[in-house]
C-alpha cells in the first residue's frame, strides 16, 4: 500500500470514529502489547494488583528515603511550609518564624494548610497515646517527613503510569522510567523535602497522566467543515462521563499547581496550545468550558482559604509576580547566568541520566514536524519535550534562577530518557555475550555513582543544622524541667513563665530550621535576618544592607551596637540558673529588634570562631558542643563545623571531658593499629616471610658473628639484583689489587661479633615482648 493510500485510510477511519479522550496506549517497539480481553472493560484509572504493589513499594521506599535525609538544602523547606503550618496548627504565639513573604501575602496558604493538618493529627495521636514530651517532639519532627514521603511515592507511581501509557504496559521503557526515578540522586535528595516545588512536581505528573493526549493525535477539522457540523458530531455522541471526569481532575490539579507556583502555568499553556490547534471545535468548546469551571472553582476556594489565613481578601499569585518581577526583589537573593538551567539545572536534575535525556529530547523534538503522521507515542514525547524546552527558556529571562524551579520537568525528562537508556543497556542485560561487558561495567559504574551522590548529599553534606537543633532540644529537656509539665504543652513565647533555654544564631540568615525542629515554644531564640528592601526606591535598594551582611562586614561593631550590654556587660550565668530570669523578647518571629539579649547558647559556623574568640575572650562563653557540617561550601560564611558556646560551666566541663575521652579513644585505636602492625610483622618474620622492602636489608640481620666480619658497604646491603664490581672510575682502569676486600676489622672480630650477638639477642627479646 502506498503512503498516500495509508494516509487516506487513516484519515477516514479517524474522522468516522467517535471522539474519545484517550486512545489505547501504543505498542512498544521492544515488546508487543497484549490486547485486552473482549469481555473485560479496562479503564485507564483501574488499578491492578501489580500497580497496587508498585505503589505500596514506592511509598515504603520513600519513607526510608525521608528518614534517611539529615541534611539542609533550602530555607524554603521550612520557612515557606512548616513554619506557617506550625502557626496555623498551634497558634500565633507558639514561636513560629513568619518571614516577610507571608507578611506581604506573597504565598498561598494551601501548602502550609496540608502540613498544619499533619501537625494537628500528630498532636492528637501524641495525646491519645500519652507520649512523653520528648517522644511528642520526635513525632512532630517526623510527621511532615512521613506526609511528604507519601506525596513523593505518588509522584513516582504516576511517572511510571504515564510511561506505561506512552510506551505500553509491558514495555521495557516503562520499567526503565521507574528505575530512573528510583535511582535518581536528585529524587533521593529532594523529593521527600517539604518544599512547595516537591508538591508541585507530584501534582504536575498526576495531571499529565490525566491529560487528554489523544486530542492532539487526531487530525483537525478541515477548513470546509463548519462549526455547525462540529455541533452535529457532538450531538451524535457526547464525551463519556469517565473521560470528562478525568479532564476535570486534570484541570483542577493543574490549577492547584499554578496557585502553588505561578510559573507552572508555562507547562499547561504549552499543552493547551497544542490541543487547541489540533482538535475539533466541539473539543475546543469543552476545553474552554472546563478550564473556566475548574479554574474558577479552585481559584475561589484558594481565595477563601487565603482570606481565612491572612484575615483579608488577597490574591497571592498576583502579588508574587508583582514583588518578584515588578520590584525585582528576587534579584536581592542572587543573580545567575542566562544559561544556568542548561549548564547547571539539567545536570543537577539528571546527573548520570543526562546523556540519555539529551538523546531523548533530540529524538522527540525531531518528530515535531510529523505530528499528523506519527503515532500517539511520538506525539506525547514531542509535547513533553516541548514543555521541557519552553519552561527553562522563559525562566531564563528572570535574573534569579534555582534548579528547583524546573523540578516539575524531571518526571517528563525521565520518560524521555527511557528509550535511549533501553537501547543502550538492554542488550547488555538480556544477552550473555562478552562483547557487551563494557556496557555492563558502565551500568554498574553509573549505579554506584548515583548511590554515592545520593548518600553523600543526604547524610554527610550540610548535616550540621539538624544536629545542632536536636542538641538544643535535648538541652532544653535537660535544663528546663519546669517547662516540661503536661500543663505547659502550649505556652506562649511572650510569656516568660515557664522559662526555658535561650539561643542566638550568629549565622547567615535561615541557615537552620526553626520551630519545626526546636518544637518547644519555651526555647527562646533569635537569628540574623536578610529581609529584602520592600517598598524602597532604586537608590535605597542600591545601598541597602541586611542584618546578616552588617554583622559579617564588622562583627565587633555589630555586637557592640546590637547586643544588649554590648561587649562589656555579658551574662555570667545561663538564664535557667539565674534567680531572676532575663526578660525574653518575642524575637523568634521577627528579628528586627534594635538589640538581642546575650543567650545561654551561642551558635555559629567554625569560620567565625577565631573572631569570636578574640571578641569574647573575657566572657564566660566556652565551647560545649561541635558537630560536623560540610567538608566544603561555596559560601565562605558557612564553612567548617557548627559550634555551640554556652555559659553553663558544668556543660563546658562535660564537653571538655567528653572531648578528652574521645581523643584518648582515638589515640588508643591508633596505638592498637601500630601494635597490630608490629604483631603481623613479627609473625611474618617467624614464618620466614619478609616484605620486599625488608629483603633488601635482610643481610644486616642475618650476619653471624665471625672473626672475619667485614664492615664494608656490600656486606650490610644486598640488592635484589646482582651487583657488578666496578673496574673503572672516570674512564681510568682500577688496578686489580684495589678490587679486593681487606678484612681490616679482623683484629677486633671476636669482640665486635660478641657485641653484635648481644644486640641481636636483645632485639629478639623485645620482639617477643611486643608480639
Curated annotation (Swiss-Prot):
One Gene Ontology term from the biological process aspect of the record: GPI anchor biosynthetic process
Membrane topology: Multi-pass membrane protein
Transmembrane segments: 49-69, 251-271, 285-305, 341-361, 378-398, 410-430, 441-461
EC annotation from Swiss-Prot or TrEMBL: 2.4.1.-
Highest taxon in the source lineage: Eukaryota
Location of the region described as Disordered in the Swiss-Prot/TrEMBL record: 1-47, 575-594
Pathway assignment: Glycolipid biosynthesis; glycosylphosphatidylinositol-anchor biosynthesis
UniProt subcellular location: Endoplasmic reticulum membrane
GO cellular component: endoplasmic reticulum membrane
Pfam families, per database record: Glyco_transf_22
Keywords: Endoplasmic reticulum, Glycosyltransferase, GPI-anchor biosynthesis, Membrane, Transferase, Transmembrane, Transmembrane helix
EC class (word): transferase
Cited function: Mannosyltransferase involved in glycosylphosphatidylinositol-anchor biosynthesis. Transfers the third mannose to Man2-GlcN-acyl-PI during GPI precursor assembly.
Family affiliation: Belongs to the glycosyltransferase 22 family. PIGB subfamily.
Protein name: GPI mannosyltransferase 3
Organism: Aspergillus fumigatus (strain ATCC MYA-4609 / CBS 101355 / FGSC A1100 / Af293) (Neosartorya fumigata)
Taxonomic lineage from the root: Eukaryota, Fungi, Dikarya, Ascomycota, Pezizomycotina
Gene: gpi10
Amino acid at each position: 500500500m502506498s503512503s498516500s493510500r495509508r494516509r487516506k485510510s487513516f484519515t477516514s477511519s479517524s474522522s468516522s470514529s467517535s471522539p474519545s479522550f484517550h486512545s489505547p496506549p501504543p505498542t512498544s517497539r521492544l515488546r508487543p502489547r497484549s490486547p485486552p480481553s473482549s469481555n473485560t472493560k479496562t479503564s485507564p484509572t483501574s488499578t491492578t494488583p501489580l500497580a497496587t504493589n508498585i505503589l505500596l513499594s514506592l511509598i515504603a521506599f520513600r519513607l526510608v528515603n525521608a528518614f534517611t535525609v539529615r541534611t539542609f538544602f533550602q530555607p524554603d523547606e521550612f520557612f515557606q511550609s512548616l513554619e506557617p503550618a506550625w502557626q496555623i496548627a498551634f497558634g500565633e504565639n507558639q514561636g513560629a518564624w513568619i518571614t516577610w513573604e507571608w507578611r506581604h501575602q506573597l504565598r498561598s496558604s494551601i501548602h502550609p494548610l496540608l502540613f498544619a493538618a499533619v501537625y494537628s493529627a500528630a498532636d492528637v495521636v501524641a495525646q491519645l497515646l500519652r507520649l512523653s514530651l520528648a517522644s511528642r517532639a520526635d513525632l512532630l519532627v517526623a510527621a511532615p517527613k512521613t506526609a511528604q514521603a507519601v506525596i513523593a511515592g505518588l509522584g513516582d507511581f504516576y511517572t511510571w503510569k504515564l510511561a506505561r501509557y506512552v510506551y505500553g504496559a509491558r514495555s521495557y521503557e516503562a520499567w526503565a522510567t521507574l528505575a530512573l526515578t528510583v535511582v535518581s540522586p536528585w529524587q533521593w535528595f529532594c523529593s521527600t523535602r517539604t518544599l512547595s516545588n516537591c508538591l508541585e512536581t507530584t501534582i504536575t505528573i498526576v495531571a499529565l497522566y490525566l491529560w487528554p493526549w489523544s486530542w492532539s493525535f487526531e487530525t483537525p477539522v478541515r477548513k470546509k467543515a463548519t462549526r455547525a457540523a462540529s455541533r452535529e458530531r457532538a450531538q451524535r455522541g457526547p464525551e463519556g462521563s469517565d473521560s470528562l471526569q478525568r479532564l476535570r481532575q486534570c484541570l483542577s490539579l493543574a490549577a492547584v499547581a499554578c496557585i502553588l507556583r505561578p510559573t507552572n502555568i508555562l507547562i499547561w499553556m504549552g499543552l493547551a496550545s497544542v490541543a487547541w490547534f489540533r482538535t475539533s471545535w466541539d473539543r475546543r468548546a469543552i476545553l474552554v468550558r472546563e478550564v473556566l469551571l475548574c479554574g474558577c472553582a479552585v481559584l475561589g476556594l484558594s481565595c477563601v482559604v487565603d482570606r481565612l489565613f491572612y484575615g483579608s481578601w488577597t490574591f497571592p499569585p498576583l502579588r508574587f509576580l508583582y514583588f518578584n518581577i515588578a520590584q525585582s526583589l528576587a534579584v536581592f537573593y542572587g543573580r545567575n547566568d542566562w544559561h544556568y538551567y542548561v549548564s547547571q539545572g539539567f545536570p543537577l536534575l539528571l546527573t548520570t541520566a543526562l546523556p540519555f535525556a539529551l538523546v531523548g529530547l533530540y529524538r522527540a523534538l525531531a518528530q515535531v514536524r510529523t505530528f499528523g503522521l506519527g503515532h500517539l507515542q511520538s506525539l506525547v514525547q514531542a509535547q513533553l519535550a516541548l514543555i521541557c524546552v519552553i519552561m527553562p527558556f522563559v525562566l531564563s529571562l528572570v535574573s534569579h534562577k534555582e534548579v528547583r524551579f524546573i523540578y516539575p520537568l524531571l518526571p517528563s525528562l525521565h520518560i524521555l530518557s527511557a528509550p535511549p537508556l533501553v537501547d543502550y543497556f538492554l542488550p547488555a542485560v538480556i544477552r550473555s555475550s562478552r562483547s557487551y561487558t563494557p556496557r555492563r561495567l558502565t551500568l554498574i559504574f553509573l549505579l554506584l555513582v548515583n548511590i554515592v551522590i545520593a548518600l553523600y548529599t543526604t547524610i554527610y553534606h550540610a548535616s550540621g543544622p539538624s544536629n545542632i537543633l536536636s542538641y538544643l532540644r535535648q538541652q532544653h529537656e535537660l535544663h528546663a524541667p519546669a517547662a516540661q509539665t503536661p500543663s505547659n504543652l502550649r505556652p506562649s513565647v511572650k510569656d516568660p513563665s515557664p522559662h526555658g533555654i535561650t539561643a542566638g544564631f550568629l549565622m547567615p540568615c535561615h541557615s537552620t530550621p526553626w520551630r519545626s525542629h526546636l518544637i518547644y515554644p519555651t526555647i527562646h531564640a533569635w537569628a540574623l535576618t536578610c529581609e529584602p528592601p520592600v517598598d524602597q526606591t532604586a537608590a535605597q535598594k542600591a545601598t541597602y544592607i541586611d542584618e546578616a551582611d552588617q554583622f559579617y562586614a564588622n562583627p565587633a561593631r555589630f555586637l557592640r551596637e546590637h547586643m544588649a550590654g554590648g561587649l562589656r556587660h555579658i551574662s555570667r550565668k545561663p538564664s535557667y540558673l539565674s534567680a531572676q530570669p532575663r526578660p525574653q523578647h518575642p524575637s523568634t518571629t521577627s528579628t528586627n529588634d534594635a538589640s538581642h539579649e546575650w543567650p545561654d547558647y551561642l551558635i555559629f559556623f567554625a569560620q567565625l570562631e577565631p573572631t569570636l574568640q578574640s571578641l569574647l575572650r573575657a566572657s564566660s562563653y566556652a565551647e560545649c558542643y561541635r558537630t560536623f557540617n560540610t567538608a566544603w561550601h561555596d559560601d565562605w560564611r558557612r564553612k567548617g563545623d557548627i559550634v555551640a558556646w554556652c555559659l553553663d560551666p558544668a556543660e563546658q566541663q562535660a564537653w571538655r571531658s567528653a572531648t578528652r575521652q574521645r581523643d584518648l579513644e582515638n589515640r588508643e585505636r591508633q596505638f592498637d593499629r601500630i601494635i597490630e602492625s608490629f604483631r603481623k610483622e613479627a609473625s611474618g618474620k617467624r614464618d620466614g616471610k619478609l616484605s620486599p622492602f625488608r629483603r633488601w636489608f635482610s643481610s644486616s640481620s642475618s650476619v653471624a658473628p665471625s672473626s672475619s666480619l667485614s664492615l664494608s658497604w656490600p656486606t650490610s646491603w644486598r640488592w635484589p639484583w646482582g651487583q657488578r664490581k666496578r673496574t673503572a672510575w672516570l674512564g681510568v682502569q682500577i688496578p686489580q689489587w684495589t678490587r679486593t676486600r681487606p678484612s681490616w676489622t679482623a683484629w677486633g672480630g671476636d669482640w665486635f661479633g660478641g657485641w653484635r650477638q648481644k644486640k641481636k639477642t636483645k632485639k629478639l627479646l623485645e620482639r617477643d615482648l611486643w608480639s
